[in-house]
Amino acid sequence: MSGRFIVLDGIDGCGKSTQLDHLLGWLPGSGLMPAGAELISTREPGGTPLGRSVRELLLHTRAEQAPAPTAELLLYAADRAQHVERLILPTLERGDWVISDRFSGSTMAYQGYGRGLDRQLIDQLERIATAGVQPDLTLWLTLPLEESLRRRQGDQADRIEAEGQVFLQRVIDGFAAIAEQRQWSAIAADRPPEAVSRALERELMDRLG
């Protein structure tokens, strides 16, 4: 594989979508990408046609039809396996670049730390679903819980976001532990979007340049 795989991760409200859009415009002219390489934007869950159906099951199902915690974990793994095999791996093998809104770290943070599911099981499922494909760089947008809640006031929460503050704090703590274990790049997101964008650009130049 000669392409590069970049992931933006963090809790809801941290600005992943805004910064992903910025990087889609910035990266092709940054000098980091080889001439002729394409930049593909994707997300988890929902980066493939099958994944979009899984996303609806995971995030927008009525309470009485919501998956149980272990079923939820397996659905995320199925989405990821399809995503890697049908989109991420073929793109990297062509020499193109992939930038994704979330990847396997989110599953460990939300299902492992947030829900308290068996982390060894999550690791096993990750190895199966990713087939060894891992990001070249994960950019973790850090945000305190209070700021996440403030930014999302008035927004319609999906099923995971609606779990409550104690759950979300466990997720934040999980992200911090995972970031240290996996040597992610932590970028403070509690500042104006333009400042976050400049910090991301510097980190990409330092790590991939």
Swiss-Prot record:
One of its GO terms (molecular function) is ATP binding. It comes from the Bacteria. ATP binds at residues 10-17. It catalyses: dTMP + ATP = dTDP + ADP. GO terms for cellular component: cytosol. Its EC number is 2.7.4.9. Keywords: ATP-binding, Kinase, Nucleotide biosynthesis, Nucleotide-binding, Transferase. The keyword Electron transport does not apply. One of its GO terms (biological process) is dTDP biosynthetic process. It holds the Pfam family Thymidylate_kin. It is an enzyme of class 2 (transferase). Phosphorylation of dTMP to form dTDP in both de novo and salvage pathways of dTTP synthesis. Belongs to the thymidylate kinase family. This is Thymidylate kinase. The gene is tmk.
